[in-house]
C-alpha cells in the first residue's frame, strides 16, 4: 500500500541507499530539541515551582522531577539512541564492505522507535492511565523496534565481504547487550533488588550507551580527520572494558530500571553490603581503563582537526573534541559520587543530579551528535545549510551546558554546606544561582534548534558535493621517507600503517664545501641524447644518432 502512495509514503519503502540512516539521524536531531526543552524546564521549575501553573487548567501539573525524567528519556532514547543507531546503519555496511540488508526496514522501524519514546515521555508525566502502567508499554515497543534493528544489522554482517574493524563491533555489541542484559536482569532477579537495580542501570549505561557512542565516535574521528585510528589495541581495550566494568556515569540510584520493568521491580532503598561495596568500587575504578583508552585514541587520531567550523567537509569535529576532552574529568567526578553512594556516606548526593545531566550534555550528546554531523555529507550528498549556524549551534550548546550546569552545581554545593551546618533557612544566593544556571542552560535549547534546522534544511538546500572530499593523513599512507633515526612507534603515530613502505634517505655527515661549475657540469647535468629522422619503407621514423651522424651534423653546421 505504501509503495503505491504518492510523495513521502512511497519514499519510506523505496529502499534508497542511506535512507534508513538518514531517517534515524534526522529524527534524533528533532528529539534533541525536545530533550533540551524538558531539561531546561525542569531546571527552571527547581527554583520556581509555579512557573507553569497556568497549564493546570488543561489538566497538566508541571513537576520538576517528572520533567527531568522526561528529559532523560528524550535524551537517551530519543536523541542519543537514534543518532547512534542511525550512524550504525551507515558505519557497519561500510566496514563490512556490503550494503544494509534492508533500508526499508530501517526506515519504517525508526518511526516505531519514535512512538516508543513518545510513550516513555508520556509515562514519565503520568505513569498510570486507566490502571495501566505506561512506561513498561513504551519499553516493550522499544524492545520490538530494537529487535528489528539487531536482525537488520546481523544480516548485514553475515553478508560482509571483508573483516569488520573494531568500531563496527563496538556498535554491534552495544545493540546486542540491551536485550541480553534485560533477560539476565529478569532471570537473576536483579530488577527486584535495590543493588541489582543500581547495577543493571550502570551496566546498561556502559554496554549499550557507552559502547555505542564510542563506536560511532571512533569511526567518525578517523573519517573526519582523515587519519587512521591511532591504536587498534586501545579500541579493543574500550570494547572489552565497556562489557567487563561498571560505568560510573549517570544517576546514583536505579529508579529508571524500576520504572522500565514495572511490575517486575519493587521500590527499594539502595543498601550495599561490604562485599558488594568493594566489588562495585573496584569495577567502577576499573572503568577508567576503557575511558582513558577511548579519550587518548580520539584525541591523537583527531590531532589538528579542531577547526571544522570553517570547512563544510569536516562538520562535527568540534563536538567530538569536546566529548573526548571532558569525558575524563566528568568520569572522575562521577566515580566520587557513585562511590559515596555505594559506601552509604551520601555526602555528595546533592550534586549527583547535576553531574548526571552534565555527563549527558557534555559527553554523550556531543559525541553522538558529532558523529552524525561527520557522516552528514556522505549520507545526504550535500553540505550543511550554513557553517555559521553550525558554529553558533556548537557555541550555544557548549557554552550553555558548561556554564549553566557549573553554576547549578555551585548552588548544589552551597545547599550541601547549609545542610551540613544544619541551617534551616534556604540561601537566597543559592536560589539566584539556580536562576542564572537555568537561564544559561537555555543556550542548549537554542543550539539544539540551530543544529536541527541546519541539518534538515541542508538536506534540501545545502550545497551539493560535486566530488568526494579527499582526506589524507599528515603523511602518505603508501610511503614514508626516513630522514633521521626514528622509532617504529613514532612512525605509526604519524599515520603510517603496516603496509606503508619506508624509504631511508642517505645522509653525508662530512664537511660541506663549495661545488665548482666544472664538477657540476660533469656530474650533475645529464648527457643529451640525439635522434635522427629517416625514411623506412615509405614512412618517417626515428633512430638514435651514432658517431657518423654526429660528425656529419657538426660539419654541416661548420659550413
State each model region's role.
Residues 1-559:
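Hydrophobic alpha-helical transmembrane segments of multi-pass integral membrane proteins
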Amino acid at each position: 500500500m505504501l509503495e503505491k502512495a504518492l510523495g513521502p509514503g512511497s519514499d519510506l519503502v523505496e529502499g534508497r541507499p542511506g535512507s534508513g540512516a538518514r531517517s534515524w539521524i534526522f529524527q534524533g536531531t528533532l528529539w534533541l530539541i525536545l530533550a533540551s526543552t524538558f531539561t531546561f524546564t525542569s531546571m527552571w521549575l527547581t527554583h520556581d515551582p509555579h512557573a507553569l501553573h497556568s497549564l493546570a487548567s488543561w489538566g497538566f501539573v508541571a513537576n520538576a522531577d517528572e520533567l527531568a525524567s522526561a528529559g532523560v528519556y528524550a535524551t537517551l532514547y530519543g536523541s542519543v539512541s537514534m543518532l547512534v543507531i542511525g550512524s550504525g546503519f551507515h558505519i557497519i555496511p561500510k566496514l563490512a564492505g556490503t550494503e544494509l540488508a534492508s533500508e526499508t526496514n530501517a526506515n519504517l522501524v525508526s518511526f516505531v522507535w519514535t512512538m516508543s519514546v513518545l510513550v516513555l515521555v508520556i509515562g514519565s508525566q503520568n505513569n498510570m492511565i486507566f490502571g495501566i502502567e505506561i512506561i513498561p508499554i513504551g519499553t516493550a515497543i522499544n524492545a520490538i523496534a530494537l529487535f528489528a534493528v539487531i536482525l537488520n544489522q546481523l544480516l548485514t554482517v553475515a553478508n560482509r565481504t571483508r573483516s569488520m574493524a573494531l568500531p563496527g563491533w563496538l556498535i554491534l555489541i552495544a545493540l546486542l547487550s540491551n536485550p541480553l542484559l534485560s533477560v539476565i536482569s529478569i532471570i537473576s532477579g536483579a530488577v527486584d533488588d535495590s543493588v541489582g537495580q543500581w547495577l543493571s542501570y550502570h551496566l546498561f549505561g556502559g554496554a549499550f550507551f557507552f559502547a555505542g557512542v564510542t563506536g560511532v565516535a571512533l569511526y567518525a574521528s578517523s573519517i573526519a580527520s582523515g587519519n587512521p585510528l591511532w591504536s587498534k589495541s586501545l579500541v579493543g581495550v574500550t570494547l572489552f572494558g565497556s562489557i567487563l566494568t561498571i560505568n560510573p556515569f549517570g544517576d546514583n540510584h536505579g529508579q529508571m530500571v524500576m520504572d522500565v520493568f514495572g511490575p517486575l521491580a519493587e521500590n527499594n532503598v539502595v543498601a550495599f553490603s561490604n562485599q558488594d561495596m568493594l566489588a562495585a568500587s573496584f569495577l567502577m575504578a576499573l572503568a577508567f581503563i576503557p575511558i582513558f583508552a577511548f579519550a587518548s585514541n580520539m584525541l591523537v587520531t583527531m590531532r589538528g582537526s579542531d577547526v571544522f567550523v570553517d570547512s563544510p567537509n569536516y562538520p562535527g569535529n568540534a563536538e567530538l573534541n569536546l566529548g573526548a576532552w571532558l569525558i575524563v574529568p566528568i568520569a572522575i567526578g562521577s566515580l566520587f559520587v557513585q562511590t559515596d553512594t555505594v559506601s552509604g556516606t551520601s555526602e555528595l548526593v546533592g550534586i549527583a543530579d547535576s553531574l548526571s545531566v552534565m555527563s549527558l550534555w557534555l559527553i554523550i550528546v556531543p559525541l553522538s551528535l558529532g558523529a552524525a554531523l561527520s557522516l552528514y555529507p556522505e549520507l545526504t550528498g550535500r553540505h550543511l545549510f550554513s557553517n555559521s549556524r553550525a558554529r553558533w549551534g556548537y557555541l550555544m550548546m557548549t557554552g550553555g551546558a558548561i556554564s549553566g550546569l557549573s553554576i547549578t552545581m555551585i548552588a548544589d554545593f552551597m545547599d550541601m554546606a547549609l545542610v551540613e551546618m544544619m541551617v534551616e533557612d534556604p540561601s537566597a544566593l543559592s536560589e539566584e544561582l539556580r536562576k542564572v544556571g537555568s537561564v544559561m542552560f537555555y543556550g542548549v535549547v537554542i543550539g539544539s534548534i540551530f543544529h536541527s534546522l541546519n541539518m534538515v534544511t541542508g538536506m534540501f538546500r545545502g550545497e551539493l558535493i560535486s566530488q568526494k572530499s579527499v582526506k589524507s593523513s599528515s603523511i602518505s599512507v603508501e610511503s614514508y621517507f626516513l630522514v633521521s633515526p626514528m622509532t617504529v612507534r613514532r612512525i605509526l603515530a604519524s599515520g603510517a600503517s603496516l603496509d606503508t613502505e619506508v624509504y631511508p634517505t642517505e645522509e653525508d655527515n662530512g664537511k660541506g664545501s663549495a661545488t665548482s661549475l666544472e664538477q657540476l657540469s660533469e656530474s650533475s647535468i645529464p648527457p643529451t641524447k640525439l635522434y635522427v629522422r629517416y625514411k623506412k619503407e615509405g614512412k618517417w621514423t626515428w633512430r638514435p644518432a651514432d658517431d657518423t651522424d654526429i660528425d656529419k651534423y657538426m660539419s654541416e653546421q661548420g659550413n
